[in-house]
Amino acid sequence: MPTLRTTYPGWICAFACACGSLLFSPPSVATNDYGLPSLGAASTSVSNEEYRLGRAWLRQFRAQAPQWQDPITNDYLQSLIARLAPHSDINGLRTITVMVDNASLNAFAVPGGVVGINSGLFAFAEDEGAFVSVLAHELGHLSQRHYARGSARAAQTQLPAMAAMLAGMLIAASGGGDAGMAAAMGSQAALIQDQLSYSRLFEQEADNIGLQAMADAGYDPEAMVRMFSAMQRMARLQGDTPPEFLLTHPVTDNRLSAAQARAAQLNVADAYTSDTLYDMMRARALLSIY
């Protein structure tokens, strides 16, 4: 298995910082207990800002990233997404696929319908069902507009957190000493914990959308459970240096158990996978890696 870790070049970091200033307008929908739009509510529309952000990202990607130029494999990737899309609640969103010439395990979805994979995903996923489970999860992120909702949540929490931190600094400056610094540090910790909580919620939503889409499209949702188990084993083996995908998509015991329970509830009609075709595409990816 090739090395499964990516160090992102400076242009990606710079682009991410620029994107941070593009806060999307939160949709006017019912919220759940976490203060986020309820599951399914966020899939009603894609804003112009999301389209612009996605196209800006795509221009940067095509100019800077090492692309895997393989039309045959890209056609295969598009066919898998086309099979999942009608069942993924993306409301006719036109998707664009990109492939990265990188041996690390990674897949991503960018606002506006850009779906990408690393060639290393083929190396890690042993069958078509496992590979599709990752695509279904990423389409779930697009369906629920997680980037837009995350930006909206950040806008809601950062100012209160900053106010609390400044208040703590004022206490310290006024002679409060340790108490003031503790208040300032506590506000920062609370903000980080809030972000982690919403990240876990987003992963659960994307899992649920993905599992249902797999079943409706004729894929065995248990393939996602198998993929999660394989990812969890990799994370444990690699310790402090897991691939970037597992840093942004951590597979916890709770997440694995939830996926197992959900998959067991789903029925698959007309199940079909083409592992022979997948094996051919996987071989092409392995040749490009080595």
Locations of the language-model features?
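Hydrophobic or amphipathic, alpha-helical segments that drive membrane association/targeting
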Residues: 2-108, 191-192, 234-237
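Extracytoplasmic and endomembrane cell-envelope/extracellular-matrix remodeling and assembly machinery
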Residues: 39-44, 55, 67, 75, ...
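Membrane-active amphipathic alpha-helices enriched in small hydrophobic residues
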Residues: 158-178, 182-192
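Short pre-active-site segment immediately N-terminal to the catalytic Zn-binding motif
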Residues: 116-133, 196, 201
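Catalytic Zn2+-binding segment of zinc metalloproteases
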Residues: 129, 139-156, 174
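Surface-exposed patches in mature extracellular/periplasmic domains of secreted proteins
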Residues: 64-74, 87-97, 147, 151-154, ...
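Active-site recognition of the HExxH zinc-binding catalytic motif
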Residues: 117, 133-141, 145, 206
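Signal peptide-directed extracytoplasmic domains
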Residues: 83-84, 88-126, 252, 256, ...
